[in-house]
Regions:
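C-terminal regulatory/interaction module of P-loop NTP-utilizing enzymes
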Residues: 1-310
Length: 310
C-alpha cells in the first residue's frame, strides 16, 4: 500500500504507480498516451477473421472498423448470428489490448456503466455503504494499469477495452448519457474525465479516460422487442458499422467455384458433396437471418457485411 507521500507524487505525475487502485487522479498523467496502431493492421485483422471462420464480403468493412477505432469508439450492428461479438474480440487481439466483457440488459442504469453505492459488510460484520465502480470505470482502471506496464515491460498488452454485448437491450441514452462529453473523440484531456460522486476517498473522485481506451459495442438491430432509440448526441460518439449476412448470391457463387475446383483437383472432388451440403446449410441459415432484418437502429454506416461460417 502506498503512503501519503507516494500518492501525492502519483497525483503530481512525478512518480508512476504499478496500479491506479489507490488513486484515480493520477490517471491524468497517462491519459494522453496515444493508441499504438499495429503495423499492417488491415492484413492482420483480415487474417485473424479468416482463421476464425468469418466471412466479409467487402474490405471496406475492415477499413471502416480500423478508421473508427483510430477515431474513437465503434458499434457493430446487425442481425444475430453474424459474428459481431467474435469480431469484437478478434479486433482487441489484433490491436494487442485486453478486454472487459459485459452483456447489457433492460435493467441497466448509470450504476452499471459508471458506478454507485452498494451495501456490504466490514471486517466486524457490520453493514456499510461503499462505492462500486461500473463496467466503464473498471475497464478504464485496467486500461491505465496496462498502459504503464506496457511502457516499461516487453510483451504487455497496451491497454484494456470494454466490449459491450447486446447493447440494444438497455436504454442506451439513460445508461451512457452522463458520458457524452467524456466520450467525445475531440474532447480535451480536461473534458475526458468522469466524476465519481460515490467514492468517499478524494483521490478516487475523478478518473481520466485514456486516449488508448475504446468501447466496442455489439447491437442486434432487428429484434423489435429490444431495440432502443439512440440519440444524435450519443450516435456522434460512436462509429456505427453494419455487420450483415453475406449477399444473397454469395453461396451460389461459392458452390459454382467448388464445382470448378473439383474438375481439376481430384482430392477436392472427393469432398465436393460435403462442401455442397455445408454451403446449402449456411445459405438457409443466412436466408433466415436476412428475412428478419427489417428494423433499423442507430446510424448505419452502409459499409459492407460480415457473416459467420459456423
Amino acid at each position: 500500500m502506498a503512503n501519503i507521500s507516494q500518492i501525492e507524487q502519483y497525483n503530481k505525475g512525478t512518480l508512476f504507480p504499478n496500479t491506479y487502485e489507490e488513486t484515480y487522479l493520477a490517471t491524468e498523467h497517462i491519459s494522453g498516451i496515444k493508441l499504438n496502431i499495429p503495423d499492417d493492421v488491415f492484413n492482420k485483422l483480415k487474417k485473424a477473421i479468416e482463421a476464425k471462420g468469418l466471412y466479409f464480403g467487402d474490405d471496406s468493412v475492415l477499413r471502416n472498423i480500423i478508421a473508427g477505432l483510430i477515431k474513437g469508439n465503434i458499434i457493430l450492428q446487425g442481425p444475430p448470428g453474424t459474428g459481431k461479438t467474435t469480431l469484437a474480440k478478434l479486433i482487441c487481439d489484433v490491436f494487442n489490448v485486453d478486454f472487459t466483457e459485459a452483456t447489457a440488459n433492460s435493467d441497466w442504469t448509470t450504476y452499471d456503466s459508471i458506478g454507485g453505492l452498494q451495501p456490504t459488510a466490514n471486517e466486524e460484520g457490520q453493514e456499510v455503504i461503499v462505492g462500486k465502480n461500473g463496467y466503464v470505470v473498471s475497464s478504464i482502471l485496467k486500461c491505465c494499469d496496462l498502459i504503464v506496464q506496457n511502457e516499461y515491460e516487453d510483451g504487455k498488452q497496451q491497454g484494456n477495452w470494454l466490449v459491450l454485448d447486446e447493447l440494444n437491450r438497455c436504454e442506451i441514452d439513460k445508461v451512457f448519457g452522463d458520458l457524452f462529453t467524456a466520450l467525445g473523440s475531440d474532447s480535451t484531456t480536461a473534458e475526458r474525465v468522469i466524476n465519481l460522486w460515490y467514492q468517499k476517498d478524494e483521490n478516487k473522485q475523478k478518473i481520466y479516460i485514456p486516449n488508448r481506451f475504446r468501447i466496442i459495442g455489439a447491437m442486434n438491430n432487428i429484434d423489435k422487442n429490444y431495440v432502443n432509440d439512440i440519440s444524435q448526441g450519443l450516435s456522434r460518439r460512436f462509429t456505427f458499422i453494419d455487420i450483415l449476412p453475406p449477399a444473397e448470391d454469395y453461396f451460389e457463387k461459392e458452390a459454382s467455384n467448388a464445382k470448378e475446383l473439383a474438375k481439376t483437383r481430384a482430392y477436392f472432388a472427393d469432398m465436393l458433396a460435403q462442401v455442397e451440403m455445408w454451403i446449402a446449410k449456411q445459405k438457409k441459415q443466412h436466408d433466415d437471418v436476412r428475412k428478419e432484418n427489417t428494423v433499423e437502429a442507430g446510424v448505419g454506416f452502409g459499409c459492407g457485411c460480415v457473416g459467420c461460417f459456423g
